[in-house]
A protein has these predicted regions:
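Short acidic-hydrophobic, aromatic-tinged amphipathic segments that line or gate anion-handling sites
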Residues: 129-144
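Low-complexity, intrinsically disordered or weakly predicted helical/coil tracts enriched
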Residues: 71, 114, 138, 145-146
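Intrinsically disordered or compositionally simple regulatory linkers and C-terminal tails
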Residues: 143-152
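The feature marks cytosolic C-terminal regulatory regions of anion transporters and related permeases
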Residues: 1-123, 128, 152
Length: 152
């Protein structure tokens, strides 16, 4: 039983975070290392492929910081389709990442957050202090964030 728990902890500690892009003209977004996909200037789309909790929050934070460390990136979208659970430690990690984004002049957005997850997050500091927006889909995020500015 202890071995099974150790294996599970090890597997969930190393969360896969994929940089994704649009496949063709579709509304599908896939890992740019595995598929021919279009990326967008100034926009980083990252799909988190595991639930977030105390056991992986530190490694997720380190990976997010590494992947977003580019002065050309203005908007970061975390695609949360595979995130079924988030504990308090992971919420604190997302708040810290959001603050890092703000300091670097970046906006952090969330997309495809499941209903039960949103129920947890909607009263948390994650949403209260989010520097960006919450989108229903990655496609909606891309459409909104890649529109030419109409400010004069």
């Amino acid at each position: 039983l202890l071995a099974i728990f150790a294996m599970m902890l090890h597997r969930t500690h190393q969360v896969h975070i994929a940089s994704v892009g649009r496949v063709g003209d579709s509304e599908q977004f896939r890992n740019i290392e595995r598929h021919t996909a279009t990326t967008f200037d100034g926009l980083l789309l990252l799909r988190i492929d595991e639930s977030l909790y105390f056991g992986n929050a530190q490694s997720v934070h380190a990976n997010l910081m590494r992947l977003s460390d580019d002065t050309n990136i203005h908007d970061i979208v975390l695609i949360m389709t595979a995130v079924n659970h988030i504990d308090l430690s992971a919420q604190e990690m997302l708040c810290a990442f959001n603050q890092s984004c703000i300091k670097r002049g970046q906006h952090l957005h969330l997309a495809e957050v499941k209903g039960p997850m949103m129920d947890i997050l909607k009263t948390s500091p994650v949403i209260e202090n989010l520097s960006g927006c919450i989108f229903l889909s990655a496609n909606q995020a891309v459409q909104s964030l890649t529109k030419p500015s109409t400010d004069l």
